[in-house]
Amino acid sequence: MYSVDLHMHTVASTHAYSTLHDYIAQAVARGLRLFAITDHGPEMADAPHPWHFMNMRVWPRTVNGVGILRGIEANIKSRQGDIDCHGRMLAEMDVVIAGFHEPVLAPVDRAFHTEALLATIARGEADIISHPGNPKYPLDIPAVARAAAEHGVALELNNSSFSHSRAGSADNCRTIAAAVRDAGGWLSLGSDAHIAFDMGNFNHCIRVLNEVNFPPERVLNASPRRVLDFLQRRGRPVIPEFADW
């Protein structure tokens, strides 16, 4: 049903276990048409060096009919919404996900988290906000959903938040999906795979979409073209190899 996965990690994030080649093979096996590698931003303790991201230019754009986007899951670093992806590194990215991670920015309170996320959205560097349903970072969800819709930023439903990580996220994720629906915004589905076997697994996300009657035309992952058009509207450069996708 969904042919794009926009959130996964390779062995370059050393708590993950698969290579780019592993993900390509799994994408072919699962019938995915496009995916983004989004290793953790460099302020995480086991994240890749900035050169890892700047050298993604050596990657092929397509392998065996599957498209590859060059991305990052950046860390929100402060109340002002700055992230650990900027300058040349930011310029090399096709897609930027950004979110809260405890080793970089410890939880504070609802007002702090909301202000930081609103600032991140307004700054324009992040295309997608990762796992905003994390209960350790309570938010003013309607305010975040409205801001994301206004700025053309997608909020993520993260499949791993229902299973491997961030216990207690489910109710928040339902609330987020409903708030994005009401605000007329975009949802992005992310497997958040740390091993290739989880790539493209959106089973929990799909259940939430159905529960809140989320409009399918506002889910990015439906097609490569929808994702590429979204990124171009956000000012990302056109990728010539995907012009006819």
Swiss-Prot record:
Xref: Gene3D superfamilies: Metal-dependent hydrolases
Cofactor stoichiometry and binding remark: Binds 3 Zn(2+) ions per subunit.
A Pfam family matched in the record: PHP
Top-rank EC class of the record's enzyme: hydrolase
Coiled coil: none
List of residues binding Zn(2+) 3: E73, H101, H131
SS bonds (residue pairs): none
Gene Ontology BP, a term: bacterial-type flagellum-dependent swarming motility
UniProt xrefs under InterPro entries: Phosphatase_YcdX_put, PHP_dom, PHP_phosphatase, Pol/His_phosphatase_N, Pol/histidinol_Pase-like
Binding-site residues for Zn(2+) 1, renumbered to this chain: H7, H9, E73, D192
GO CC aspect terms: cytosol
HAMAP family: YcdX_phosphat (MF_01561)
Family named by the database record: Belongs to the PHP family.
Name by which UniProt lists this protein: Probable phosphatase NT01EI_1577
Native species: Edwardsiella ictaluri (strain 93-146)
